[in-house]
Amino acid sequence: MSSGGLLLLLGLLTLWEVLTPVSSKDRPHFCHLPADPGRCNALSEAFYYNPVQRKCLKFRYGGCKANANTFKTIDECKRTCAA
């Protein structure tokens, strides 16, 4: 194979890696934790990843001491956990 062909193959493999969604085995373990409102009573809006529905959902967050499957924005949740 020529060096141009190898370069093209390398470019395509790199693009495939970047565009391939996160698989369930690659998700951080905390993405499988349930929504956790925490122990405080602030009741603000937050997001968590629901592995059954395979998407990020909104929930009421108390403001402190929740698990790691708690995100301030839906985009942060999607970047971390969603496939």
UniProtKB/Swiss-Prot annotation:
Domain BPTI/Kunitz inhibitor, first and last residues per copy: 31-81
Subcellular localization(s) per the UniProt record: Secreted
The keyword DNA repair belongs to this UniProt entry's keyword annotation: no
Domain of life: Eukaryota
InterPro entries, A to Z: Kunitz_BPTI, Kunitz_BPTI_sf, Prtase_inh_Kunz-CS, TFPI/VKTCI-like
Claim: Aminoacyl-tRNA synthetase is one of the keywords in the record: no
Pfam family, one: Kunitz_BPTI
Protein name, per record: Kunitz-type serine protease inhibitor 18
Species of origin: Drysdalia coronoides (White-lipped snake)
Organism taxonomic ancestry: Eukaryota, Metazoa, Chordata, Craniata, Vertebrata
